[in-house]
Structure formats: structure tokens, C-alpha cells
From Swiss-Prot:
Organism: Enterobacter sp. (strain 638)
Gene responsible for this protein: coaD
Protein family (similarity comment): Belongs to the bacterial CoaD family.
InterPro entries per the UniProt record, alphabetical: Cyt_trans-like, PPAT, Rossmann-like_a/b/a_fold
Protein purpose: Reversibly transfers an adenylyl group from ATP to 4'-phosphopantetheine, yielding dephospho-CoA (dPCoA) and pyrophosphate.
Protein name: Phosphopantetheine adenylyltransferase
Amino acid sequence: MSTKAIYPGTFDPITNGHIDIITRAASMFDRVILAIAASPSKKPMFDLEERVALATTALQHLPNVEVMGFSDLMANFARAQQANILIRGLRAVADFEYEMQLAHMNRHLMPELESVFLMPSKEWSFISSSLVKEVARHAGDVTHFLPANVHQALMEKLK
């Protein structure tokens, strides 16, 4: 039986921390979908098409990973993709409370949907897309935290 997992998020933009999680998930499951949420209420810097394109390029070295955009409830998207595993990254204890609420709601909406929590490697444990964008806005060097294509796109957006 083939295992299919979904790693959802806004990924505005995708960081090396996200790539760390997805790379490890790709070694655990037969197929992994990086599901990029439209998230219009978050007012993303990059639109959905841009985020999908950036992530697709950054993840092209992982043959069992597919990048898709979505705007539905996660449980509905998972059901439509016939996936029953949800990957979530936990950077710190503070993330756990919110992630636990999401996991319980997703389980309520789709009882067969299991949430699997992965901690990022120590090197990436403190970064987030929001933090990287904030540092970049103030001319800080974020090269180390982003794939090259994403770094270039971020610098273009900030011009």
C-alpha cells in the first residue's frame, strides 16, 4: 500500500526550514504533496501562483514531491487527494498548542487523517517565512535561509 502525505502551509515564501521538513517527509512516505494555501486573509507577499512556482523549482530534486495550491478546508483537500497523513512542523513548544487544535479539528472533519509532527533540524529551528521577510525588509542577509530562486524573488519584491 502506498502512503501519501500532505504538508500544508502558506509558504510565503518557502524557506530552507520548510525544505528540511519536506525532504525528511519525502524519505518517510511514498508521495508527499506540498499543499500551498491561498490564505488571502494573511495578505501574502507572493500570490498563490508565485508561491507554487517558487516551491516547485526549489523542490524539483525530490521526485516524489508534488506542489499544489488549494483554497479548501485541509480535510476536504486531503480527502480529494486520497491522503490520510498530514505533516506539520513544530519549531517550538509555542507551536504545539495551535497545532494540537488543528490536529483535533482535522480529525473531527476527517477521522482517518493522522497528523505527524516533525521538528526541523536545529539549524532551521528558529526561522519562519515572516521572520525572513522582516529581516530582508531591513536589508539583513537572508541568503542562508532561502533557496537561491526564492531569495532572488524576495529581493525583487522588496525593490
